[in-house]
Amino acid sequence: VMNMWPKVKLRVTEGWDEDGNHFEDSLHYEGRAVDITTSDRDRNKYGMLARLAVEAGF
C-alpha cells in the first residue's frame, strides 16, 4: 500500500467477530479473516487492494 499510494494507510476495520455481523460460516469467527479499507476510503482502490493482498499471500 505504501508503494502504491504513499499518503494512504491501510485500515483494519475488523478481524474477529463476536457480534454476529458476518455470515454464519465466516472465517471472522475463527480469527482467520480481516476487513480492510484504505485511510481515504476510496472504493476505486479496492480492486488493487485485493490484488496486493493476494500478492502478499493472503
Swiss-Prot record:
What GO cellular-component annotations does this UniProt entry give? Answer: extracellular space; plasma membrane
Q: Does the keyword Protein biosynthesis apply?
A: no
In which residues is Ca(2+) 2 bound?
Answer: E14, D17, D19
Supply the Pfam families for this chain: HH_signal
Record's comment on post-translational modification: The C-terminal domain displays an autoproteolysis activity and a cholesterol transferase activity. Both activities result in the cleavage of the full-length protein and covalent attachment of a cholesterol moiety to the C-terminal of the newly generated N-terminal fragment (N-product). This covalent modification appears to play an essential role in restricting the spatial distribution of the protein activity to the cell surface. The N-product is the active species in both local and long-range signaling, whereas the C-product has no signaling activity.
Segments crossing the lipid bilayer: none
Q: What is this protein called?
A: Desert hedgehog protein
Top-rank taxon: Eukaryota
Identify its protein family: Belongs to the hedgehog family.
Gene3D superfamilies recorded: 3.30.1380.10
A biological process (GO) annotation for this entry? Answer: proteolysis
Which residues does the record give as Zn(2+) binding sites? Answer: H28, D35
Q: What is known of its domains?
A: The desert hedgehog protein N-product binds calcium and zinc ions; this stabilizes the protein fold and is essential for protein-protein interactions mediated by this domain.
**Positions that bind Ca(2+) 1:** T13, E14
Question: Which chain positions lie within coiled-coil regions?
Answer: none
Q: Which GO terms describe its molecular function?
A: calcium ion binding; patched binding; peptidase activity
Functional note: Intercellular signal essential for a variety of patterning events during development.
Q: What are the UniProt keywords, alphabetically?
A: Autocatalytic cleavage, Calcium, Cell membrane, Developmental protein, Hydrolase, Membrane, Metal-binding, Protease, Secreted, Zinc
Tell me the compartments it is located in.
Cell membrane; Secreted, Extracellular space
